[in-house]
Amino acid sequence: VFGPRLVGQYSSTFKNIFGSELIVAYFIAMIGFLLAGFCVIGLTDKSSLLRLPVVTDNTSSKTKLDSKATQLTVLLVVNHFVMVIIMAATPLHVQDIGETIQVVGTIISYHTLGMFVFSPVLGRFVDKVGSKKVSITGGFILLISCICALNTSDIVILHLSLFLLGLGWNFNFVSISSEISKYSIEKNTNLNIKSDSFVFVGSVFAQSSLGLTYTLIGFEGLVIFGTLAAIFLLFNLVRLSSKLLT
């Protein structure tokens, strides 16, 4: 969030040294991301990381994948993947169309506002109306944000798109995580650590491959890919809502 703001004050200096002032902004973000990752990994049960939840078959005593927990984890990962690829590619695109680093900072600020502005009340809202309604609403918002982002040359629309992208992500993340937490209590295990570890790795993969992908297919291609993933997410949220969500 503060990367573009901090860099904006010295953008000409950084551009002369590194060729692009965005390099420093991304570097600041990468350091914060890695520090957060190390903290999470250091404070969690290592045996739970990157392991899909399993259950024991009562008839054969063999373990098999826990279908509900696995499906919820996949939905959570796809939701995060859609958000990350568009969020991380937008600063590159905005600079490519000739806008300043200050505009990049404003767009990311709008996005962050969408991600967290309703967080203090969203958990209670999920408890009141149910995770099913909240997640399907989030799926629609996420898809609308991707469609808005297809209008790649309009800066005002990009501000709206990134705000909705954060908002839809937040609706889905809170509602699906809430369902995973309830299922964890039911199964007497910590499924949140497992699901969050997959979200973290998915985020690393999406961001680390972004440069090459952006070069190959451009911002429009990434947005189309994100739109298809958002359609997949919404379709499965609707299709599986009666089985997975309350």
Language-model features, listed with the residues they occupy:
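Pair of pore-lining "gating" transmembrane helices in MFS-fold secondary transporters
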Residues: 65-86, 163
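A membrane-interface helix-boundary motif in multi-pass transporters
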Residues: 8-31, 212-230
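C-terminal membrane-cytosol helix-exit motif in multi-pass small-molecule transporters
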Residues: 3, 7-8, 29-53, 236-241
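A late C-terminal transmembrane helix in Major Facilitator Superfamily
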Residues: 186-216
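Helix-to-loop junctions at the C-terminal end of transmembrane segments
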Residues: 11, 117-130, 214-215
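Structural signature of the two symmetry-related core transmembrane helices
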Residues: 133-148, 227
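Intracellular juxtamembrane helix-capping segments at the cytosolic ends
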Residues: 171-184
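Short amphipathic helix-loop junctions that connect adjacent transmembrane helices
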Residues: 88-104
